[in-house]
């Protein structure tokens, strides 16, 4: 998976700030992705635990079971540890105080799980709520939390990739080698709600982010209709249960229902949307009579150069930080490499740049097993001092190494740390291997020449055996070149569709390549490493009558082999076409589209505010998406830019809890034969 070929970006406004945490600051003891967890020498014992209240909407819930839980670390969906147990008061306050407890080793992030209780209409066995607290040993008797449907929504979307939902209960757990991924999942959820107040964070309260406040409140109102009822058979609870039943397994409470909504946000949306009360407990919420396209929860990052320039390529490092290349505006400025942490904090205000070659047009990027971020940079006539180059950045933003490379586009790194870059000339494209010699990268290795005029994405198969280059020839037609690094042979594949706009690729665990084909076929094709067409999956959405054209950009495979495809919806000028949001389509490992037919369309849910451009008239958080990546928490990241906006409207988008976690960076998955596997 690499970034796809994109157009140049226009100028817009820049915003900047560092978001604040709403929970107590986490003091994390994190394991490296793909490494054994860090062990603590002794357990930590607290004499008194946190306190708080449990509510259904704004009503206290009395007699509810309150459990302090530590996620399991023996496998995904493994049994959590119950650290402390109590019940809420029945005096009309719904309050609780946890007794003392001993933190597990290694010290972990913990959460509250609520079951049953009386919200005012009698005992309701369908009550299930949750709240993420933070690091076990940093909690104390002064920690106070409000648990309600909003904290439940945030917890469900964070924990869904690690959850097992059965008729016997809910289990949250990860593997011993992905404690980092589970810990990181707490951070974006922490930005969605205030756990001390039990309210959703306002849409623009955290600078550099646009939060899905209206969507969080809408989901909370749907759950509250069941919580504040007489039980599972009630007219507002039974439909929630039936509409969130997955594979014949019905949820036993509202927490399980929320987990299922997080994992299947495009399922039964109209039926669920209509469950909220006409006088709902949480506002502001979506008030339109028309339900949203789906119930994805996403955060739009628009700080610093992102809002102005948009994003192009994207990669996730071992810590779970997202690295994004931002192009320069058409003013002769310099582009930048941006870093976004799981908590939403940014790197330096202007991003990371290099003084030697300059950075104008970033195209591709990839992260090597040692954590160096390699970026393809192209020169520009507006910056005559810049030169085409491959630039390696250390995680602190300093330059590790840099050297000239002619018009580099796609970038991938294999398991040994060698860089593979596609290159574009006027007559042909090529891709080459830039070797790692004891940490010093030199420009002196394999070059494979192809016949197409536009190089594109580069993808590497398991154990670095195969390297794929996608050449998007536009009107000349596309071709895919396979280079076997063992036999040193080259094979050219002409897509079965005859497509002329194939820009993205990803390789699965079996070594098959998945191609994003945005031509008239409009779908995904899968080829074996012998060049045989295995599958072709069409994606709905082309509408030539209205001028709506799907341009599939890139795709990524999650830890269960599901494919996520980013789609830029092209609004052909002059034909009266409406405003179209960007799209994210999900296919399962068998190729069936499991997202809505037109894909997920993440939104903040806020009312339209006017403006110009494809996205500015809407509250969409997915702006003409391009590059795509999945992190160790199961979040899907996309770069994007609003090409036609007259004010800043571009985002890097994080869709929460939608995918299965993957090994990061991708080069480590290649090295360890863990592509499309969970860590």
Regions found by a protein language model. Name each.
Residues 1-15:
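N-terminal secretory signal peptides that target proteins for export/translocation
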Residues 34-312:
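Feature for extracytoplasmic/surface-facing segments of secreted or surface-associated proteins
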Residues 22, 41, 55-57, 212, ...:
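Residues embedded in well-ordered secondary-structure elements
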Residues 29-32:
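C-terminal motif of bacterial Sec signal peptides marking the signal peptidase cleavage site
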Residues 26-27, 129:
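Residue-level signal for mature regions of secreted extracellular proteins and peptides
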Residues 269-679:
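Flexible "stalk/tail and boundary" regions
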């Amino acid at each position: 998976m690499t970034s796809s070929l994109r157009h140049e970006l226009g100028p817009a406004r820049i915003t900047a700030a560092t978001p604040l945490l709403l929970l107590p600051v986490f003091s994390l003891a994190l394991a490296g992705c793909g490494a054994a967890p860090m062990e603590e020498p002794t357990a930590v014992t607290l004499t008194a635990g946190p306190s708080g209240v449990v509510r259904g909407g704004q009503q206290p819930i009395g007699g509810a079971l309150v459990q302090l839980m530590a996620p399991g670390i023996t496998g995904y969906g493994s049994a959590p540890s119950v650290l402390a147990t109590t019940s809420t008061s029945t005096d009309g306050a719904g309050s609780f105080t946890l007794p003392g407890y001993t933190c597990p080793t290694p010290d972990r992030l913990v959460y509250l799980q609520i079951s049953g209780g009386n919200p005012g209409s009698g005992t309701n066995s369908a009550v299930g709520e949750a709240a993420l607290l933070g690091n076990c040993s940093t909690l104390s008797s002064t920690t106070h939390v409000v648990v309600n449907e909003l904290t439940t929504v945030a917890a469900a979307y964070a924990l869904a990739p690690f959850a097992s939902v059965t008729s016997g209960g809910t289990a949250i757990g990860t593997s011993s080698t992905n404690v980092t991924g589970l810990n990181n999942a707490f951070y974006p959820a922490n930005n969605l709600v205030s756990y001390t107040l039990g309210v959703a964070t306002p849409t623009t309260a955290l600078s550099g982010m646009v939060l899905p406040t209206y969507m969080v409140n809408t989901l909370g109102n749907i759950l509250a209709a069941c919580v504040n009822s007489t039980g599972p058979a009630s007219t507002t609870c039974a439909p929630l249960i039936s509409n969130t039943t997955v594979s014949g397994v019905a949820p036993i409470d509202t927490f399980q229902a929320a987990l299922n909504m997080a994992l299947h946000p495009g399922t039964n949306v109209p039926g669920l949307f209509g469950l909220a009360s006409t006088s709902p407990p949480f506002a502001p919420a979506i008030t339109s009579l028309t339900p949203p396209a789906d119930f994805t929860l996403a955060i739009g990052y628009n700080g610093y150069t992102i809002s102005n320039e948009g994003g192009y390529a994207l990669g996730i490092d071992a810590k779970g930080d997202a690295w994004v290349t931002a192009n320069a505006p058409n003013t002769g400025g310099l582009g930048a490499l941006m870093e976004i942490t799981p908590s939403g904090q940014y790197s330096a205000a202007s991003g990371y740049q290099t003084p030697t070659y300059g950075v104008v047009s970033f195209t591709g990027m990839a992260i090597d097993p040692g954590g160096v971020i390699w970026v393809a940079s192209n020169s520009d006539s507006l910056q005559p001092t810049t030169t085409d180059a491959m630039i390696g950045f250390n995680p602190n933003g300093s330059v590790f190494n840099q050297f000239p490379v002619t018009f580099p586009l796609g970038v991938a790194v294999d398991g040994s740390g060698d860089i593979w870059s596609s290159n574009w000339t006027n007559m042909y494209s090529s891709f080459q291997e830039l070797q790692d010699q004891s940490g010093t990268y030199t420009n002196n290795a394999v070059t494979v020449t192809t016949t197409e005029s536009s190089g594109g994405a580069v993808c590497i198969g398991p154990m670095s055996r195969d390297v794929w280059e996608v050449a998007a020839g536009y009107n000349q037609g596309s071709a895919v070149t396979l280079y076997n690094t063992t036999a040193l042979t080259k094979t050219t594949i002409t897509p079965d569709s005859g497509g002329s706009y194939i820009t993205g690729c990803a390789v699965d665990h079996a070594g098959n390549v998945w191609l994003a084909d945005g031509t008239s076929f409009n779908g995904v094709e899968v080829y074996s490493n012998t060049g045989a067409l295995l599958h072709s999956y069409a994606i709905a959405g082309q509408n030539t009558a209205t001028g709506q054209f799907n341009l599939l950009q890139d795709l990524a495979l999650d830890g269960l082999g599901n494919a996520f495809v980013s789609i830029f919806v092209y609004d052909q000028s002059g034909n009266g076409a409406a405003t179209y949001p960007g799209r994210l389509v999900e296919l399962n490992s068998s190729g069936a589209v499991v997202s809505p037919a037109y894909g997920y369309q993440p939104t903040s849910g806020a009312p339209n505010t006017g403006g110009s451009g494809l996205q500015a008239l809407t509250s969409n958080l997915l702006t003409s998406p391009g590059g795509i990546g999945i992190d160790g928490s199961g979040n899907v990241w996309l770069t994007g830019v609003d090409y036609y906006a007259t004010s800043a409207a571009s985002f890097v988008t994080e869709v929460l809890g939608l995918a299965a976690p993957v090994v990061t960076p991708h080069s480590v998955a290649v090295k360890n034969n863990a592509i499309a596997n969970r860590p």
